Amino acid sequence: IAEQLGLSKFVSVQNPYSLLNRTYEIGMSEIAKYEGVGLLAYSPLAFGYLTGKFRNGARPANARVTLFSRFSRYSNPESEWATEQYAQLAERHGLTPTQLALAFIKQQFFVTSTIIGATNLDQLKENIQAFEIDLSEDVLQGIQAIHQQQPNPAP
């Protein structure tokens, strides 16, 4: 339509994308690549769940999930199981859960940028460092194995 009307075409879309929500891969990534549209991945840490700070039912006092408890997309049993599996995978490979989650997103061919949301300097540093990591084939296979057992628990 943009071509026919002489308008600028879309060059990016902003969709949720994380280890817990990979629905973008189902059709959208292929179309986006074909059309030259990049993904600005938002909520890459799944509201903080993929950082590991909510493991074992923890609820830090100032966390968004604690302050806004009605946001339960990531607190269902399937998401909690997958989150724990990803955290354990990260630990087995000497990574933090945050590093695993962000490095995975960085390595997807259709992602052009990732929207991060740090609330302090330490989080910002960890987020930035994660983009310097290239996950090994072994780690990527581990991620895929978890995804196959529990695909998209928080779409």
Give the ranges of each region predicted by the language model.
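Substrate/cofactor-recognition hotspot
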Residues: 153
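Beta/alpha (TIM)-barrel catalytic core signal, keyed to glycine-rich beta->alpha loops juxtaposed to Asp/Glu
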Residues: 1-145
